[in-house]
């Protein structure tokens, strides 16, 4: 019963991770954030692998899923520090997130709740200047929205990591018990004795 509840909980967590990752992938596509797009794609693939491992009793899949979740937590912690400008990440924002291939930033920069976008009037701006509009009136600035999204990913990943370790341990314990039972049966098995095809007959001595 405990194993079943653990498996069901892990599948539920994986489904929540898929939903959150797909939602994030859509907004990253809209903002042309290529580095997060690649990371989200890998995350979706590994989460699907974790679901398959849970449903088909594959402990190795769950171990791989657990390792990826540790990397995923580190990546999202980096994104939180990045958007909250911890250290010198803000100096290379465009280069890191979109590989410096476009003039876009986060989709939430211009489409956040309550944001009012005003085009910049005046002489043409150089291509290196990405500030083509002014954004005012946002109820929540886009760095905080991105940080909250990453915090949600970390929250789900931590729960997934704990349950994946638990379920994979249950699977490995069951595999070990099956191997032990199989080896015990092999020792207890006795091969049938071969019967001789020679037939003994009484020898009569002539009188």
Curated annotation (Swiss-Prot):
It is found in: Cell membrane. Its main location: membrane. Glycans are attached at residue 100. It is a multi-pass membrane protein. The chain crosses the membrane at residues 2-22, 35-55, 62-82, 147-167. Pfam families: NKAIN (PF05640). Keywords: Cell membrane, Glycoprotein, Membrane, Transmembrane, Transmembrane helix. One of its GO terms (cellular component) is plasma membrane. Belongs to the NKAIN family. Interacts with atp1b1 C-terminus. This is Sodium/potassium-transporting ATPase subunit beta-1-interacting protein 1. It comes from Xenopus tropicalis. The gene is nkain1.
């Amino acid at each position: 019963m405990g194993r079943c509840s653990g498996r069901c909980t892990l599948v539920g967590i994986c489904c929540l991770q898929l939903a959150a990752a797909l939602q994030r992938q859509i907004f990253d596509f809209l903002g042309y954030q290529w580095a997060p797009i690649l990371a989200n794609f890998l995350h979706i693939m590994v989460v699907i692998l974790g679901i398959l491992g849970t449903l088909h009793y594959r402990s190795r899949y769950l171990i791989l899923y657990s390792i990826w979740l540790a990397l995923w937590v580190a990546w999202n912690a980096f994104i939180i520090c990045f958007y909250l400008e911890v250290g010198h990440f803000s100096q290379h924002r465009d280069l890191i997130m979109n590989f410096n291939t476009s003039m876009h930033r986060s989709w939430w920069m211009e489409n956040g709740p309550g944001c009012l976008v005003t085009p910049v009037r005046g002489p043409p701006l150089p291509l290196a200047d990405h500030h083509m509009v002014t954004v005012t009136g946002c109820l929540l600035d886009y760095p905080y929205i991105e940080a909250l999204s990453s915090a949600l990913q970390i929250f789900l990943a931590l729960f997934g990591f704990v349950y994946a370790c638990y379920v994979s341990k249950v699977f490995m314990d069951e595999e070990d018990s099956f191997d032990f039972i199989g080896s015990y049966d092999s020792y207890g098995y006795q091969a049938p004795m071969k019967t001789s095809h020679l037939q003994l007959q009484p020898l009569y001595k002539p009188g």
